[in-house]
Amino acid sequence: MHRSFLFMIAALFACQSSYSSKFQNEEGGFPEPSVLLKNAHEAAQSFAGVGRLQAAMSCTAFLWKPEGARPEAKALALTNGHCVMPYTDRATTYDIWVNRPASSEWKLILNYFADTTEAQKPIVIQSIVYASMKAVDLAVLELQASWAELEAAGLKPLPQALKSAKAGFPIRTVGAPLGPFPYAEQFLREARCVEETRVSIVEWYWTWFDTHRNSCADIHEGSSGSPVLNAQNEVFAVLNTTSATGISDSCYLGNPCEMQRPGTVMVANKNYAMDIVGLQECFDDQTLAFGSDCPLPGPETVAYRDAPAIPTRPVDRQGQPLHWTVQAENAIWKMGAVGDIDCRDDDDYRREPLPTGELPQENGVYLLCLQKEDADERFPTVVVLSLDTRPPTLKPELSLWYSERGVSFEPIFKVPELSFFWVGFGPQEGTSCETLKLTPYRRIPIHVDKRNLPARICVQGEDHAGNRGPIFSYDVNAEEPSRVLPRNMRPEASGQKPKKHDVIRKQ
């Protein structure tokens, strides 16, 4: 397999899947399709406290109540950090947000069932109590409504699990994916599968430790922030990303990789969730209280700047080696390839200037671990370096559309494998794509006048690291084909839609 948050919302970044929509779970069978929840007869009332979050991205969030919270206290909701933070900013790998105001337009829509839309309950988000994408991808939001007000309306928090689900045991996710569903079905859905294992993952800028893995079906953009529940309907994790829309093993956005020995592996069609068992230990009378029993990183952190792009090549366009340029104040550090290093182990941290030598030459993912002296070893700042010198092998798809004046075309992006294009065209007779001068595609459709048909179109893809693939040729005739789809609408062979970042990141 050649190289590739939930909603991160926006996250934008169109990728398309090259995998089958069916995938085997740990029991050897296939996960059940998700079910649209209906509540006209209160059959799903226990999930009325799960809803559509409209914040920095469109996600899922759910009511979560600290122990001892007073009835008059403002209610809280849980979701992913990437649903409220500017996740395209690399500072999210070390920034911790505590007690920040929320946009006046943000809201959580509860009672979010397809058959009782008139009973929906929109609640304004008052503040961001906590948000992080460092080590964990979680956010705690304060609502304008109190616990007493919500519970009087039949909106109750999900019960908190005291232990994580065991591998092989049944679980379920409840969320509001947008995905491929028609608008009338973009409401709460339940998907069932089994808990598989715990793994640490790397995705683009971020590293997340000890996530829960499952194969529940129909996890799409909008699913970010969905609760993951055990057989007793107790929440133990929060869904944050999926490889179901991944197209390569580059560990890029939308292509999470598991950190194994040696190196990273993208396992197709897997979902990953943040553990929240022990989250109650982070609150004292609904006030944040960081400590050794709290599984959230505190605001004391190591910031850095001047990190390499992801992915990158170890040399520049002229073939000159690239060097480490990362800068961080008062940091101890260590560096190594995924599988060879554990950033959470205090051993081997160096008390010397940060590296300035050449980047490693071998393809793979490397971690530069940063810590402060005597800091909590559970939550290092991690700078991800992804090196890739492999040319993309995917053949670009063209979107064609005809008019009385001729034919226009544009290549279809599949980030990160096909992030840039070089294009050209000439007469079908006598044009060789190997010798034709190609120019950068500027994201403006290219027109071929009907007088120049039939024509030969030549396209070369370039991946996000700057590696160019083979040149492909496409012959276009003067006759309009019987079926040419509108621009940017040509489907994948798999029938799946491009991933947007809700990361479910499209996400």
Q: PLM features: what roles do these ranges have?
A:
Residues 287-507:
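Low-complexity, disordered linker/stalk regions enriched in Pro/Thr/Ser/Gly
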Residues 81, 100, 209-210, 218-220, ...:
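C-terminal subregion of chymotrypsin/trypsin-like serine protease catalytic domains
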Residues 7-14:
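Bacterial N-terminal signal peptides
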Residues 15-73, 94, 281, 285-297:
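Protease-domain processing segments flanking chymotrypsin-fold serine proteases, especially trypsin-like
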Residues 1-4:
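Positively charged n-region of N-terminal signal peptides that target proteins for export
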Residues 64, 236-237, 469:
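Generic structural signal for well-ordered beta-strand positions
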Residues 25-27, 45-57, 66, 71-74, ...:
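Serine endopeptidase catalytic core focused on the charge-relay Asp
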